[in-house]
């Protein structure tokens, strides 16, 4: 279930459970490893960098780091400041409670930040802290206007669009009367939604503000992952561009049609920049595939019926750029850069020649080009697109860049970067006119003290042919103390999404280096359905979950077993989460005894149940196509339901570990429980690790360590 927020996922997953606070000031770990091998405890000892902001003069950078205590089972966000060359690093945080979302104000004289649900400010040296807001409702995000006279405040409001409010005389009643869809989202019941408020900044502080969406039952930013990046100030501080999907109930659950709106703070008038004023959306049948409905007709595609998010004004104020997907209901459609000319209303898509996703971007200082991050062949690099649509790749290498911004000198960019052997760190990029030649200098070394104690597995890349004659790339991760003369147990890694790239990602759970440290070779294929290999490759999977993508998995592991002498073909396992978990459940009935064990995390097991269980109904509508009860199913829908993993349990013959979070409303926990129960009824060795308090991810430190220990205990039991 690929989202626009791919680049921010690691930071989000690492910080979401930091809300619970204690008086213990959790800081940088001084853990000493007992061996040169990575452990679960070492993973949780790592600082997690994010939220970097360069000062207006480009000379300093403020950023935040998340630290965790396994003992306390909590995390803590800390603010740091440093020179833009990486020198003079200083910790600004003094509280045991989170201080986050730092930004520069007053021309760089002060730093604003969030603390205990309010906006505060301080000097760049951390002195003279001052509370700026006194909101009765927690502030969850903010953004000052360029002139410093106004501020956007993100607050949550009660919402009863899908869940009725209980009678006032039953204050202890816990039941929820649901009247429409969108009553649950990701990991929570939808009983509040976020709204943006525009407040004035005065000498006496910040006013309460005006709700941009007053009396409108819509959220902004978009749940569950959207943040302040979905709103932007105009250069003259008079307008705000914001992202919103103005739908409720079934319409919300079935549609990905978010738009960019322009709000004038003086007149309080709002204009939809994506659609004409007289636009009327074609009727949608939620039980039929959106692929062939009128909403996705060639004529209606001119009205931006897909995702439109993350607006950014050009420095000269003439344009607004945003990320845009063409089709409604297709959350993994190609992310393009749309440039809107404010004077004429003309929209231009400037990355059409780049046949992959744009994941983040920033304007160049001349307003004539845009820097963007894009995935290609398993790596996320920096590109530049002119307003005329000319695209050039600036950086190259086996890594993933993320969260890019231009420094005020117009000559350097600040970005995060990570790879399979390094967690995210900050880099300064110096663009070069020559293709793939831009220099990137590392300026933070947050976890060097831990890396210096570890031996990491080598990363390699290999290409092989698929069953239909295409070229398939897969990553190979070798064991930490690799001996080419030995044979090793080997894991086939099945990616989720189903359209998320197997890039040079770093995960604090699905971490390839901890697999290497435990003596496993990892085979990680960029199978059919993944971005970075062209639209045809990416889109082939929709409606064909059990076809060519599964053949690609088997092509990769068969190639490795046949041609890599260190791969022990008699000790193979398959592991994966989400769509990767679905893949494991399917392969369990179709692997012809290749594998000796399986691990499936939060995977779909019964696709008929999944069609109506998942809360984002657009996903199953697009991927499975028609509702399973329809008598005139499309051919893809028929194949999808006929090949659901639960229909092949009679062919299961291999030990399987099922893992699931009970707060996972994307793929409900009954999917994992059903798979485990089926295996045990058939007498197959199986275990179920269930987390009552985790969602699609595992976010709490002790749960994370339990996950890792269970994961490797299971693999070691059957593969060593």
Please tell me what each predicted stretch does.
Residues 487, 498-512, 527, 670-671:
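The serine-hydrolase catalytic nucleophile loop
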Residues 83-87, 123-127, 201-204, 264-268, ...:
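Short loop/turn segments that connect beta-strands within beta-propeller blades
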Residues 478, 486-496:
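Short beta-strand element of the alpha/beta-hydrolase
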Residues 67-71, 158-161, 247-250, 326-330, ...:
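Short glycine/acidic-enriched loop and turn motifs that connect beta-strands
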Residues 22-27, 76-77, 153-215, 243-246, ...:
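Predominantly five- to eight-bladed beta-propeller fold
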Residues 46-61, 96-112, 129, 136-151, ...:
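Conserved beta-propeller blade repeats
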Residues 445-485:
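N-terminal cap/lid segment of alpha/beta-hydrolase-fold proteins
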Residues 511, 516, 524-720:
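Active-site-proximal cap/loop segments of hydrolase catalytic domains
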């Amino acid at each position: 279930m690929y989202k626009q927020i791919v680049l921010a996922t690691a930071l989000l997953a690492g910080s979401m459970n930091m809300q619970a606070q204690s008086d213990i000031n959790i800081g940088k770990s001084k853990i000493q490893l007992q061996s040169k091998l990575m452990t679960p405890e070492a993973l949780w000892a790592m600082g997690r960098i994010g939220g970097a902001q360069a000062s207006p003069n480009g000379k300093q950078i403020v950023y935040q780091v998340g630290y965790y205590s396994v003992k306390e089972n909590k995390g803590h966000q800390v603010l740091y400041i440093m020179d833009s060359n990486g020198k003079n690093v200083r910790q600004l945080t003094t509280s045991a409670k989170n201080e986050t979302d730092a930004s520069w104000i007053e021309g760089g004289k002060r730093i604003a930040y969030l603390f205990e649900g309010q906006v505060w400010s301080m000097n760049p040296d951390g002195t003279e802290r001052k509370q700026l807001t006194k909101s009765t409702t927690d502030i969850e995000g903010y953004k000052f206007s360029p002139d410093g006279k106004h501020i956007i405040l993100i607050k949550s409001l009660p919402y009863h669009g899908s869940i009725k409010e209980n009678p006032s005389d039953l204050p202890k009643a816990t039941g929820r009367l649901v009247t429409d869809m969108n009553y649950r989202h990701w990991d929570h019941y939808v009983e509040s939604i976020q709204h943006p408020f525009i407040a004035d900044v005065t000498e006496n502080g910040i006013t309460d503000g005006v709700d941009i969406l007053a009396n409108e039952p819509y959220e902004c930013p978009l749940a569950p992952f959207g943040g302040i990046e979905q709103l932007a100030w105009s250069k003259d501080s008079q307008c705000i561009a914001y992202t919103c999907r103005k739908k409720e109930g079934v319409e919300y659950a079935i549609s990905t049609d978010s738009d960019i709106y322009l709000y004038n703070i003086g007149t309080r008038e709002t204009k939809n920049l994506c659609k004409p004023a007289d636009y009327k959306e074609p009727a949608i049948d939620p039980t039929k595939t959106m692929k062939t409905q009128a909403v996705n007709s060639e004529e209606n595609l001119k009205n931006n019926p897909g995702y439109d998010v993350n607006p950014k004004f050009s420095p000269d104020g003439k344009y607004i750029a945003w990320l845009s997907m063409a089709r409604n209901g297709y959350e993994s459609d190609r992310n393009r850069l749309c440039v809107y000319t404010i004077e004429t209303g003309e929209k231009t898509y400037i990355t059409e020649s780049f046949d992959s996703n744009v994941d983040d971007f920033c304007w160049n200082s001349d307003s004539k080009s845009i820097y963007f991050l894009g995935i290609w062949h398993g790596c996320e690099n920096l590109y530049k697109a002119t307003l005329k649509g000319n695209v050039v790749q600036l950086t190259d290498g086996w890594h993933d860049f993320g969260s890019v911004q231009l420094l005020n000198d117009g000559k350097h960019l600040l970005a995060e970067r990570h790879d399979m052997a390094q967690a995210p760190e900050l880099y300064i990029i110096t663009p070069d006119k020559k293709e793939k030649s831009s220099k990137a200098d590392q300026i933070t070394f947050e976890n060097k003290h831990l890396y210096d104690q570890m031996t990491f597995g080598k990363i390699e890349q290999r290409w092989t042919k698929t069953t239909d004659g295409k070229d398939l790339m897969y990553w190979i991760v070798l064991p930490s103390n690799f001996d080419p003369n030995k044979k090793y147990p080997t894991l086939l890694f099945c990616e989720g999404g189903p359209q998320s790239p197997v890039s040079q990602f770093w995960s604090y759970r699905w971490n390839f280096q901890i697999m290497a440290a435990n003596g496993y070779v990892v085979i990680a294929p960029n199978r059919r359905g993944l971005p970075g290999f062209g639209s045809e490759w990416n889109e082939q999977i929709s409606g064909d979950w059990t076809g060519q993508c599964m053949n690609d998995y088997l092509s990769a592991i068969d190639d490795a077993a046949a041609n890599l002498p260190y791969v022990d073909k008699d000790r193979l396992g398959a592991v994966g989460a989400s769509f990767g978990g679905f893949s494991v459940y399917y392969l369990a009935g179709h692997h012809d005894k290749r594998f000796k064990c399986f691990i499936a995390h939060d995977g779909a097991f019964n696709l008929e149940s999944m069609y109506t269980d998942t809360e984002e109904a657009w996903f199953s509508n697009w991927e499975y196509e028609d509702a399973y009860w329809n008598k005139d199913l499309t051919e893809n829908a028929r194949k999808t339901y006929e090949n659901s993993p639960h229909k092949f349990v009679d062919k299961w013959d291999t030990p399987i570990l099922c893992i699931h979070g009970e707060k996972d409303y994307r793929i409900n926990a009954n999917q994992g429980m059903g798979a485990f129960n089926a295996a045990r009824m058939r007498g197959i060795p199986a275990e179920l690790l269930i987390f009552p308090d985790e969602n699609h991810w595992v976010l709490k430190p002790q749960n994370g360590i339990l996950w890792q220990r269970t994961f490797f205990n299971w693999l070691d039991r059957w593969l060593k």
